[in-house]
């Protein structure tokens, strides 16, 4: 005999349909849209920072007054 396993869902439970009003529903959807856009923009900023940091350091270093060699710009010392 195989025992049935049940999955318990963690997180906030959805409110019942009778207790929600249209104003709270619209506020909830506005919050969700704001949250989605915030997460999307932060992910894009993270990727841009990840791939743009080293080229930025190289550009700033090459525009400095005593022009260093590329090796000096890339070395951590």
UniProtKB/Swiss-Prot annotation:
Task: Report keywords, A-Z.
Answer: Acetylation, Membrane, Mitochondrion, Mitochondrion outer membrane, Protein transport, Transmembrane, Transmembrane helix, Transport
Predominant place of localization: mitochondrion
Q: Disulfide connectivity? A: none
Q: What induces it?
A: Up-regulated after antimycin A or rotenone treatments.
Residue ranges of the region described as Disordered: 1-30
Reading the lineage from the top rank, the first entry is Eukaryota
By its UniProt entry, which PANTHER family does this protein fall under?
MITOCHONDRIAL IMPORT RECEPTOR SUBUNIT TOM7 (PTHR34944), MITOCHONDRIAL IMPORT RECEPTOR SUBUNIT TOM7-2 (PTHR34944:SF4)
Family the UniProt entry places it in: Belongs to the Tom7 family.
Query: Per its record, how is this protein called by name?
Result: Mitochondrial import receptor subunit TOM7-2
Organism taxonomic ancestry: Eukaryota, Viridiplantae, Streptophyta, Embryophyta, Tracheophyta
The gene for this chain is TOM7-2
């Amino acid at each position: 005999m195989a025992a049935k396993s049940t999955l318990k869902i963690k997180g906030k439970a959805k409110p019942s349909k009778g207790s929600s009003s249209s104003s709270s529903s619209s506020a909830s959807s506005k919050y969700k849209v704001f949250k989605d856009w915030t997460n999307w923009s932060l992910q894009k900023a993270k990727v841009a920072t990840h791939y743009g940091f080293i080229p930025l350091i190289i550009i700033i270093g090459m525009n400095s007054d005593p022009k260093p060699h590329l090796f000096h710009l890339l070395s951590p010392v």
